[in-house]
């Protein structure tokens, strides 16, 4: 299996300006993300990693460290639009698979990236794939910032929601009691996606779905329009991303340890 990892990177960030270029152990964060993916066991020769940046500064930083990069427009309304442009710039075929890895995840697990790509390759009915892991507390289950997903018998997503789904009508939960969560446990969505390139090119042209707007979840647009999303069940939660200066300091400490 061969696939392409696209890492969208834009300089504008309200909480952490110039985030892709933030130094982590002597290299920009977006470079650390690319290096992390390339370090995955068994991925050598199977994965092409490309940063899709919106500034020449990002492109130059990647090139200095030997990371492939393409310059995309600054006016894209969403990350999906940026990825679609990158696919065109790279002349990728419609049947190829790309994985969207966020540029602020220097601790991403390369095996998770490979698993999501492999799942899509083996699920011909799906247009895209993603991942999830078990929720182990009621507080997490009820948190609106935690996106939940429910699957069908084939491991395809039925729905994503910020609400606690599924709802166990006859089994009330006790506050912060992991033992009260029914089995099998509910699933927390991990924001990692693989796409068939042809679908990724169509996606930005699809009308926004009412449920997408209500939940503020872009992946619901695919379900609304009848496309299927395969879901890989990961054994544990992914490493933390970088959204704030405090997150950045924690990651710097981990790289320096």
Curated annotation (Swiss-Prot):
Top-rank taxon of the source lineage equals Bacteria
Transmembrane segments in this chain: where? none
Signal sequence coordinates:
none
Q: What is its EC number?
A: 2.7.7.38
What's in the keyword line of the UniProt record?
Answer: Cytoplasm, Lipopolysaccharide biosynthesis, Nucleotidyltransferase, Transferase
Q: InterPro entries, alphabetically?
A: Cytidylyl_trans (IPR003329), KdsB (IPR004528), Nucleotide-diphossugar_trans (IPR029044)
Which one of the record's GO molecular function terms can you name? 3-deoxy-manno-octulosonate cytidylyltransferase activity
Coarse class of the primary localization is cytoplasm
Q: Does the keyword Cytoplasm apply?
A: yes
The record ties this protein, via Pfam families, to: CTP_transf_3
Q: Does the keyword Metal-binding apply?
A: no
Q: What is a biological process (GO) this protein takes part in?
A: lipopolysaccharide biosynthetic process
Q: In which pathway does it act?
A: Nucleotide-sugar biosynthesis; CMP-3-deoxy-D-manno-octulosonate biosynthesis; CMP-3-deoxy-D-manno-octulosonate from 3-deoxy-D-manno-octulosonate and CTP: step 1/1; Bacterial outer membrane biogenesis; lipopolysaccharide biosynthesis
- CC annotations in GO: cytosol
Please name the SUPFAM superfamilies in this protein's record: Nucleotide-diphospho-sugar transferases
Q: Where in the cell is it found?
A: Cytoplasm
Catalyzed reaction equations: 3-deoxy-alpha-D-manno-oct-2-ulosonate + CTP = CMP-3-deoxy-beta-D-manno-octulosonate + diphosphate
Q: Which family does it belong to?
A: Belongs to the KdsB family.
Q: What does this protein do?
A: Activates KDO (a required 8-carbon sugar) for incorporation into bacterial lipopolysaccharide in Gram-negative bacteria.
| Protein's recorded name | 3-deoxy-manno-octulosonate cytidylyltransferase
For this protein's source organism, the top of the classification is: Bacteria, Pseudomonadati, Pseudomonadota, Betaproteobacteria, Burkholderiales
